[in-house]
């Protein structure tokens, strides 16, 4: 049986999981084998098997901000999970581990270190997570999506995104021939963002009818009815859906996006070439979403709107001052930030480390 065996370590959020899946695809396309190390009762436990990848799990959860009992048990938990990760690495004869972040990454990486298996890490956010910060001391390659996340030279590779998003036509081609109202996409993640669901309809109601953009608004799970009711009560027309299954078409048709600033969102915006009004999730670990947002804003590819400053009046003022020319400029600037070969770059770095 040809090919090398790689163990991907990622979990907890889509921002860790989906970039890792893109790298898994790249490795498998090159004839290599992939297994996945995740946590029990987790998002990755629901998602990863759908892609035909063997999933192994550890019984571990995060410790930051959690109760004193869990912190006191950490040495025992770490010992047990490292031993289990070592067993998994030996069982599958893993030749290189790739850490993307999440609770499971540290014990998996420590197990690899103790067994002499090469470690590669990929950091998706502008502020490196705790697991990756620790593993960077032992890693053979340190890769990252945002400048300054780490100081290691030659590690800037961007965030892996789906090829169909990277392959969208350039902004100038997409925007050509567009007339009439701006088309704005609102996404708060798969669970939605209550603050966007509440504020966006109110902001549109403050604008004259002929100045209102055309809205395509993802409510998030279980929130469609209340969102549509709010739009209807305010007399504002909008197309609302619970979850957008075809994000490629949504990005293709939008002039602008109103969204959070997770690493995966920023990667998709730059890959597609779309400007954004970015409202970072204020409770993200190390406030990394604000740092992610600044990456786009500094390139004049959008605006940063801290949640504490987000009001219907402020948003209405911003929307009222937009035009398609400005949106196109933001979109073009966003596209210049894209690193569309990220998944292949991470895969090739790991293959070289496993050699």
Swiss-Prot record:
Pathway in which this enzyme or protein is active: Cell wall biogenesis; peptidoglycan biosynthesis
Top-rank taxon: Bacteria
Pfam families (UniProt xref): Glyco_tran_28_C, Glyco_transf_28
Species annotation: Neisseria meningitidis serogroup B (strain ATCC BAA-335 / MC58)
Subcellular location as annotated: Cell inner membrane
Main localization (coarse): membrane
Keywords assigned: Cell cycle, Cell division, Cell inner membrane, Cell membrane, Cell shape, Cell wall biogenesis/degradation, Glycosyltransferase, Membrane, Peptidoglycan synthesis, Transferase
Name of the coding gene: murG
PANTHER family tied to this protein: GLYCOSYLTRANSFERASE, UDP-N-ACETYLGLUCOSAMINE--N-ACETYLMURAMYL-(PENTAPEPTIDE) PYROPHOSPHORYL-UNDECAPRENOL N-ACETYLGLUCOSAMINE TRANSFERASE 1
Keyword Cell membrane: yes
Topology within the bilayer: Peripheral membrane protein
InterPro entries: GlcNAc_MurG (IPR006009), Glyco_trans_28_C (IPR007235), GlycoTrans_28_N (IPR004276)
Keyword 4Fe-4S: no
Residues that coordinate or bind UDP-N-acetyl-alpha-D-glucosamine: 13-15, 125, 162, 190, 244, 289
One cellular component (GO) term of this entry: plasma membrane
Function, as annotated: Cell wall formation. Catalyzes the transfer of a GlcNAc subunit on undecaprenyl-pyrophosphoryl-MurNAc-pentapeptide (lipid intermediate I) to form undecaprenyl-pyrophosphoryl-MurNAc-(pentapeptide)GlcNAc (lipid intermediate II).
EC number(s) recorded for this UniProt protein: 2.4.1.227
Identification of the protein by name: UDP-N-acetylglucosamine--N-acetylmuramyl-(pentapeptide) pyrophosphoryl-undecaprenol N-acetylglucosamine transferase
One GO molecular-function entry: undecaprenyldiphospho-muramoylpentapeptide beta-N-acetylglucosaminyltransferase activity
């Amino acid at each position: 049986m040809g090919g090398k065996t790689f163990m991907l370590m990622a979990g907890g959020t889509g921002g860790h999981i989906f970039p890792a899946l893109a790298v898994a695809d790249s490795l498998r396309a090159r004839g290599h084998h992939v297994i996945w190390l995740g946590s029990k009762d987790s998002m990755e436990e629901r998602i990863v098997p759908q892609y035909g990848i063997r999933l192994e799990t550890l019984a571990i959860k995060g410790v930051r901000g959690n109760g004193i009992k869990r912190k006191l048990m950490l040495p025992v938990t770490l010992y047990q999970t490292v031993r289990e990760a070592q067993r998994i690495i030996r069982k599958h004869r893993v030749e290189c581990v790739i850490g993307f972040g999440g609770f499971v990454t540290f014990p998996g990486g420590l197990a690899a270190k103790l067994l002499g298996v090469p470690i590669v890490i990929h950091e998706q956010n502008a502020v490196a997570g705790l697991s990756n910060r620790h593993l960077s001391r032992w890693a053979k390659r340190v890769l990252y999506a945002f400048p300054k996340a780490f100081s290691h030279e030659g590690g800037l590779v961007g965030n892996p995104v789906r090829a169909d998003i990277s392959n969208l036509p350039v902004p100038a081609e997409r925007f050509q021939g567009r007339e009439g109202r701006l088309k704005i996409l609102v996404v708060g993640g798969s669970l939605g963002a209550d603050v966007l669901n509440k504020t966006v309809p109110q902001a549109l109601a403050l604008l004259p009818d002929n100045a209102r953009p055309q809205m395509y608004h993802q409510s998030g799970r279980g929130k469609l009815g209340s969102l549509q009711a709010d739009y209807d009560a305010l007399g504002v027309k909008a197309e609302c859906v619970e979850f957008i299954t075809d994000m490629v078409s949504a990005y293709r048709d939008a002039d602008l996006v109103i969204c959070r600033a997770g690493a995966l969102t920023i990667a998709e915006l730059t890959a597609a070439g779309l400007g954004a009004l970015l409202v970072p999730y204020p409770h993200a670990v190390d406030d990394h979403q604000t740092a992610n947002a600044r990456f786009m804003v500094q390139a004049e590819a959008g605006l940063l709107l801290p949640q504490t400053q987000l009001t219907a009046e402020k948003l209405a003022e911003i929307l009222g001052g937009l035009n398609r020319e400005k949106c196109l400029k933001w979109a073009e600037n966003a596209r210049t930030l894209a690193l569309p070969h990220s998944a292949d770059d991470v895969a090739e770095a790991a293959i070289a480390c496993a050699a």
